[in-house]
Regions:
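A short LG(V/I)-centered, amphipathic sequence patch enriched
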Residues: 15-34
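Short beta-strand-centered segments that line the small-molecule binding cleft or hinge
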Residues: 43, 47, 62, 85-89, ...
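Flexible hinge/capping segments at coil-to-helix
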Residues: 63, 133-170, 252-254, 259-262
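Central regulatory/effector-binding core of bacterial HTH transcription factors
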Residues: 67-128, 193, 201
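A late-sequence structural motif
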Residues: 82, 235-278
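Hydrophobic hinge/microswitch elements
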Residues: 105-118, 124, 178-235
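Secondary-structure junction motif
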Residues: 124, 148, 154-155, 168-190, ...
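Beta-alpha-beta core module
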Residues: 130-138, 142, 205-254
Length: 282
């Protein structure tokens, strides 16, 4: 381990600031605080370190016989079959590749993408704001559906209104998530009061189980609803929810020149366009 004395560190920092031509840190009694220029430089440094780490991982993968190692991030409310179908398509193109899959909120995933910890992020674009360092592409738009368990009292009714939906407790996605924002906007536009909810959850699996064990209601995108309806887990209710959601993918500018990333992007496009479904193996 190498130790650096404070005078030597101060001298090095001064030389770095002279080289950059801008102050990078503010000096305080309790230490240093990055300036706006310092924050920017730290961001670049983190991305460089992440890229070096990813390069080491790819080299190690190649030594073990793998051709590529890619890292994908996806949000919990994304279509459950889209990313897995894209991964299968990518592995057909690169049989020896390794794929890492992370699930989190879009804000967290986009930060990791910018820092070089992820190669691609797939998620809802409803609240997405463009970022200078990222490219983005819309994959599809879809409607939102109100869902319940099979056999729910509302499933036998040919048509529903807001009053009927307010009569039951709800499972809500957390405030700030794209799907929750869409629902809140829909309620506002319809002049409706907030829906009563008992549970606020960002876990798709937990939400499905909660629906199975109760008469609570929730909301899902059309593709998610279709996917789990085919497996007998939920039923979309006969209610037209005036909400349209979007799903897309993001990647760092310039990385599409890498053949592995280019093939990963094409695999997402293929899976999105072909609506790949997995068989029910129950």
């Amino acid at each position: 381990m190498t130790f650096t004395t404070q005078p030597a560190l101060s001298k090095w920092l001064k030389e770095l600031e002279d080289s950059v031509g801008a102050p990078l840190f503010e000096r305080h009694a309790r230490g240093l605080k990055p300036t706006s220029q310092g924050h920017m430089l730290l961001g670049h440094a983190r991305r460089v370190l992440s890229e070096m780490d990813r390069a080491q991982q790819n080299l190690a993968a190649m030594q073990e016989g793998s051709s590529y190692r890619v890292a994908i991030g996806t949000s919990p409310a994304s279509a459950p079959n889209l990313v897995p179908a894209a991964i299968i398509q990518f592995l057909r193109l690169h049989p020896n590749a390794q794929v890492e899959l992370q699930e989190n909120t879009m804000n967290v995933l986009l930060e990791r993408l910018e820092q070089g910890q992820l190669d691609l992020v797939v998620g809802r674009f409803d609240n997405f704001a463009p970022r200078h360092s990222l490219c983005s592409e819309l994959l599809y738009e879809e409607t939102m559906r109100v869902i319940s368990r099979p056999g729910h009292p509302l499933t036998s009714q040919p048509s529903l209104d807001w009053e009927a939906l307010h009569a039951f407790d709800w499972i809500m996605w957390p405030v700030g998530t794209p799907i929750r924002s869409k629902l809140d906007i829909t309620l506002t536009n319809a002049g409706q009061r907030p829906l009563p909810y008992r549970v606020e959850s960002s876990s798709l699996i937990a939400n499905l189980w909660l629906l199975q064990l109760s008469d609570m209601l929730s909301i899902a995108s059309d593709r998610v609803a279709d996917h789990f309806t085919q497996r007998g887990l939920i039923v979309p209710l006969e209610f037209e929810l005036d909400a349209l959601g979007t799903l897309g993918m993001c990647w760092r500018k310039g990385t599409e020149s890498d053949q592995g990333i280019a093939d990963l992007l094409d695999s997402l496009r293929y899976a999105s366009a072909n609506q790949i479904e997995f068989p029910d193996t129950r």
